[in-house]
Curated annotation (Swiss-Prot):
Species this protein is from: Equus caballus
Keywords (A to Z) from UniProt: Acetylation, Actin capping, Actin-binding, Phosphoprotein
GO cellular component: brush border; cortical cytoskeleton; F-actin capping protein complex; membrane
This protein's name: F-actin-capping protein subunit alpha-2
UniProt-listed InterPro entries: CapZ_alpha (IPR002189), CapZ_alpha/beta (IPR037282), CapZ_alpha/beta_2 (IPR042276), CapZ_alpha_1 (IPR042489), F-actin_cap_asu_CS (IPR017865)
Amino acid sequence: MADLEEQLSDEEKVRIAAKFIIHAPPGEFNEVFNDVRLLLNNDNLLREGAAHAFAQYNLDQFTPVKIEGYEDQVLITEHGDLGNGKFLDPKNRICFKFDHLRKEATDPRPYEAENAVESWRTSVETALRAYVKEHYPNGVCTVYGKKIDGQQTIIACIESHQFQAKNFWNGRWRSEWKFTITPSTAQVVGILKIQVHYYEDGNVQLVSHKDIQDSLTVSNEVQTAKEFIKIVEAAENEYQTAISENYQTMSDTTFKALRRQLPVTRTKIDWNKILSYKIGKEMQNA
């Protein structure tokens, strides 16, 4: 092991550390960071060399953050990235600095949004917040309005998580929806992601995603927002149901075909007593 350490350059060590961090399960960033920190044993190298990994993790995970003085949380996403560590809160029309390691927001300041698409963005946000409140107990959403290739585009992001470290599991739902404001009909594109980590008496991860495409009738802002939410709700309900049914089927068939839940004797073995069983048998035969 010592020989291997000597063979690895600092650049290679940081690259490996960054991969561990980027792939940390939901809610386990700090644990992975602390483990990597011990392995690397060089805080300056880790902070400087793996800073991009901290940022990438938060962007990928749609990390929610609370800004002091404002009621609602906002998501850290690529769509709100203003560069130089600053992010956009489109609802409150502010920008703020975000520390990717501490996951803290500071220095909120007024920020002018793109007025041409703001009325559409606000309508979609209002409808989406009502939907998220109904379907996600811990859900957070952020809606962006921006011009992409000259076209007015709405981007809606949803994040919901449950971190149950005491019960040995953590999970996160993420979804991202986009549509361009065009006359008559627009194409809606979405991606849904689920990631769950269960680690009691084992180590199991569920990582799943689904791409969605649909058509949206574009009329006025309010009606278009309602129709958009109908598409979101139908797709996310279908995805959740399919995941649940699929893993129930796997539990009932595939997993049972691969391995018996109970031994052939249909009796569970108490492994803590297995040694005493053997000793007792030997004493009887003595």
